[in-house]
Amino acid sequence: MNRFTPLLLMPFLLVGCATTTPVDIAGSGTQLLARQIQTRQYDTLDKPMTMRSVVATLQDLAFTIDQADAELGTITATRYHQYTMRMTVTVVQRGNERVSVRSNARIGEDAVTDAETYQDFFAVLDKAMFLTLNRVD
C-alpha cells in the first residue's frame, strides 16, 4: 500500500502547481475580441472633453504626450519605464449619442496583446470620464 501512496498524491501535487496566464488578445484568433478589449463607448457628444480626459489619463499613467490632433481625434504618447511603450488613442463620435475611444499599444515594433494593459488604461479613463461628465472636481 505504501508504494501506491505517492502515485495517488501526484495528480494533486500537479494541480497545485497550475498558474494563470494573462489574456492574449492576439492569440485568440479574432480581431473582434481585440477590438472589444481596446475600445470603450461613452455616453457623451463632447469629443474635445473626451480628448482632454484621454490626455489626462495618459499623463496619470506616466505617458509623455508626443502628438495630439483634435481634428483627427488621435493622441499618441510614450511611456519610458522598464521598456518603451507607445500608445495611440483614437476618439471618434459615433452617431448622435456617444463617443468611441480606441487604444492601441506597442512595445518597440510589437503590438501589446495582453488585455491587462488596456483594462488598466480604461479603468483610469472610466473614472476620469465619470468625474468629468458629473462635473466633479
Place the predicted regions along the sequence by residue:
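C-terminal motif of bacterial Sec signal peptides marking the signal peptidase cleavage site
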Residues: 14-16
